[in-house]
């Protein structure tokens, strides 16, 4: 007689987080995080391997990438990803037709691929189709598309390996947009280069630059973020500045007029963090509250509406927002307790909540596979359980994908089915123990505990 498994909707527990993700990065329609144990996780759009899991299958929940425990930082571009390990090595994967991975080819990669042999990489920024990085010696490097001079090497020639930009050894931070780059030196000066059609370089003109150009004379710039065609920055006194395109109010100055030089906005409280997406911006004030402004077509501002905002708008008065990441049309944020939140566009599962439903407000994303909220497909029958060799699945609905995950959240097996009726999965070679079977159907997802004997 068949042993049938009762299908349970696994509810979300707010007490299960402890410290989970400590670093986050959102790209075009994909997301990444590094956990406290140094593991790397990815989810969302994956058509060119930008998740790094060796497939081109989209994921709607965080999936561990490899088994390394020494990931240090990560940056996501439109369709490629960069990361640095604690040993100072540089890694890249995803789209590569313009050489933005930096491996000397123009071939896309579906798994993290080491770039060169240097062990002194310090920080990275993945732009739309190009990449920049700073080494521990303060040198600046860039590679990828260069049609607007966004690499800053004085040419408009694409590069498919990291190329040093100038000879300066005092670069502190760098940020890449669609086709422009902004950076800060250790002396607090601001620099920019690349496309300047909307004034996103901030030099008071709309003329593009093919090498780093100092912006103004201030020496107290502290944080920068290059959006698609606008820029935002903080000074060391906590003031917030913006410039460039303003069609959606992404500059936050109360207008929709482009500005080609840094312009201070909202001085009510010191700001401590800011980031920019395609046509919007996110920021955290010194009191830990979360704010946003700009384009809101998919709810990426997180205020519960689809209405664009041209001034900073309070999203959450909670006083423990710590890290933010703005992407093309979705947003990620971490609180100081390590809890992860996501909102905005979710067609490819880039929010990581196990669904493909857009979210208009910050939605908590559990890092524990034991507590993922799912839909229930009542037609599903899974047997036998416990299982020795083959798990059988019966469903009246179309089953797209099955995924088997261990108790640590690691993906063990992923299978594409694209059919209804009877399915089977052979797990004879699995070690004995508890696993979670995620079944993605046309009406939603189910996560089922299975015991391998």
Identify what each model region corresponds to.
Residues 1-4, 452-453:
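Positively charged n-region of N-terminal signal peptides that target proteins for export
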Residues 4-13:
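Sec-dependent N-terminal signal peptides
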Residues 17-47, 53-56, 62-63, 327, ...:
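An edge-strand/N-cap motif at the start of beta-rich repeat modules
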Residues 30-33, 42, 80-83, 92, ...:
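Conserved core positions of repeat-based scaffolds
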Residues 36-39, 69-73, 86-89, 110-111, ...:
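Tandem repeat domain/solenoid detector
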Residues 44-61, 94-111, 144-161, 194-211, ...:
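Short glycine/serine- and acidic-residue-enriched loop/turn motifs that recur at repeat junctions
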Residues 359-371:
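A recurrent domain-boundary module in secreted/ectodomain proteins
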Residues 375-453:
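C-terminal outer-membrane/trafficking sorting elements
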């Amino acid at each position: 007689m068949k042993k049938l498994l009762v299908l349970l909707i696994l509810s979300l527990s707010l007490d299960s987080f402890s410290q989970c993700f400590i670093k986050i990065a959102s790209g075009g329609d994909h997301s990444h995080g590094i956990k406290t144990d140094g593991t790397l996780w990815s989810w969302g759009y994956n058509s060119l391997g930008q998740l790094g899991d060796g497939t081109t299958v989209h994921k709607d929940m965080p999936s561990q990438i490899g088994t390394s425990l020494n990931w240090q930082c990560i940056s996501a571009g439109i369709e490629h990803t960069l990361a640095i390990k604690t040993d100072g090595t540089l890694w890249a994967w995803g789209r590569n037709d313009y050489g933005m991975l930096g491996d000397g080819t123009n071939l896309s990669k579906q798994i993290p691929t080491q770039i060169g042999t240097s062990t002194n990489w310090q920080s990275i920024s993945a732009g739309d189709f190009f990449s920049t990085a700073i080494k521990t010696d303060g040198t600046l490097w860039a590679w990828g598309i260069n049609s607007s001079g966004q690499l800053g090497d004085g040419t408009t020639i694409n590069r498919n390996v990291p190329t040093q930009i100038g000879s300066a050894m005092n670069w502190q931070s760098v940020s890449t947009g669609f086709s422009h780059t902004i950076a800060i030196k250790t002396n607090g000066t601001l620099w920019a280069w690349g496309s300047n059609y909307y004034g996103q370089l901030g030099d008071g003109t709309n003329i593009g630059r093919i090498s780093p150009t100092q912006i103004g004379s201030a020496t107290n710039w502290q944080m920068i973020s290059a959006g698609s065609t606008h820029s935002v920055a903080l000074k060391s006194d906590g003031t917030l500045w913006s410039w460039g395109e303003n069609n959606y109010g992404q500059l936050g100055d109360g207008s929709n007029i482009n500005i080609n030089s840094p312009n201070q906005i909202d001085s009510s409280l010191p700001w401590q963090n800011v980031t920019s997406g395609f046509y919007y911006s996110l920021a955290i004030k010194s009191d830990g509250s979360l704010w946003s402004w700009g384009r809101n077509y998919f709810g990426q501002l997180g205020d519960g509406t689809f209405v664009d905002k041209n001034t900073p708008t309070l999203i959450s008065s909670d006083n423990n927002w710590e890290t933010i990441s703005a992407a093309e049309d979705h947003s990620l944020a971490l609180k100081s307790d390590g809890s992860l939140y996501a909102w905005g566009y979710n067609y490819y599962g880039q929010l990581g909540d196990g669904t493909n439903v857009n979210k208009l407000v910050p939605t908590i994303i559990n890092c524990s596979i034991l507590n993922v909220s799912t839909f229930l497909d009542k037609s599903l029958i899974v047997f036998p359980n416990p299982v020795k060799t083959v798990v059988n699945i019966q469903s009246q609905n179309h089953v797209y994908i099955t995924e088997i995950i261990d108790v640590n959240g690691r993906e063990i097996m992923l299978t594409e089915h694209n059919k209804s009726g009877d399915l089977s999965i052979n797990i004879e070679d699995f070690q004995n123990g508890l696993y979670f079977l995620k079944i993605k159907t046309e009406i939603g997802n189910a996560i089922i505990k299975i015991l391998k004997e």
